From Swiss-Prot:
The gene is psbL. One of the components of the core complex of photosystem II (PSII). PSII is a light-driven water:plastoquinone oxidoreductase that uses light energy to abstract electrons from H(2)O, generating O(2) and a proton gradient subsequently used for ATP formation. It consists of a core antenna complex that captures photons, and an electron transfer chain that converts photonic excitation into a charge separation. This subunit is found at the monomer-monomer interface and is required for correct PSII assembly and/or dimerization. Pfam families: PsbL. Its main location: plastid. GO terms for cellular component: chloroplast thylakoid membrane; photosystem II reaction center. SUPFAM superfamilies: Photosystem II reaction center protein L, PsbL (SSF161017). The keyword Cell cycle does not apply. Belongs to the PsbL family. It is found in: Plastid, Chloroplast thylakoid membrane. This is Photosystem II reaction center protein L.
């Protein structure tokens, strides 16, 4: 009963970090596309 609790707590920050990573990749892709097209 004690093991699932820390696992759930560790999953939440991993999801947030994953979303931040995707956001950074999206922003970098937009910046590079603007740089190359301009």
């Amino acid at each position: 009963m004690t093991q699932p609790n820390p696992n759930k707590q560790s999953v939440e920050p991993n999801r947030t970090s994953l979303y931040w990573g995707l956001l950074l990749i999206f922003v970098l892709a937009v910046l590079f596309s603007n740089y190359f097209f301009n």
